């Protein structure tokens, strides 16, 4: 009898992808291999967010090799938030996570997230770069940008969480499905809208340590955050705040 599996867990992992054709097949198969070590029943939902390369074809290739993987593809590009919302809407698991498809955040982290969710009776567990146990290997500029955004969010939303933007989060299905159905953010402000709405609804949000290895080779595709993205995140965040104020949230 196996003792290292979450016997009663059904986990859905949503992995948004944009121009990730170079490595998405291997990353999906690797994620499935890791999940199989601690989850008995799981699915991986890979969402091709209107890619201009062969991401959709590569996701289909992974589907053909592993029945735990299923793909969703659409045009045009809708933004990371749109991709995650699409994946969550299709998810069937009792627990639903989303994970960046570049695997800079290793999928084994979800084992700790599931454990923390049960032990702390949390509704949401989020990865935090500011957790004292986190191990970070990424550029100083990204560290500065991340901390600056944290300070802005703290002033605007008064959240008790320290890091809203890390690309790995775990939710109870009954918590995230109603929230996502009401959301409007399409881009990078998607995370803050989820957490702000959850906090207003009195949901328990816990933070867990992460290991982040920034190894992106920009010649291999994907999306790099630039100055235009920073401005867009700021504008989207202000819009989230405005909507929540307008609707009394």
Q: Model-derived features: where do they sit?
A:
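A conserved acidic beta->alpha catalytic loop
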Residues: 48-57, 103
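Acceptor/aglycone-binding surface of glycosyltransferases and processive sugar-polymer synthases
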Residues: 68-90, 95, 107-188, 214-234, ...
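Catalytic donor-sugar/metal-binding loop of nucleotide-sugar-dependent glycosyltransferases
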Residues: 160, 186, 195-213
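N-proximal low-complexity "stem/linker" segments adjacent to membrane-targeting elements
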Residues: 1-33
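Donor nucleotide-sugar binding loop of glycosyltransferases
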Residues: 20-23, 51, 80, 106
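Cell-envelope/extracellular polymer assembly enzymes that use nucleotide-activated donors
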Residues: 10-12, 43, 193
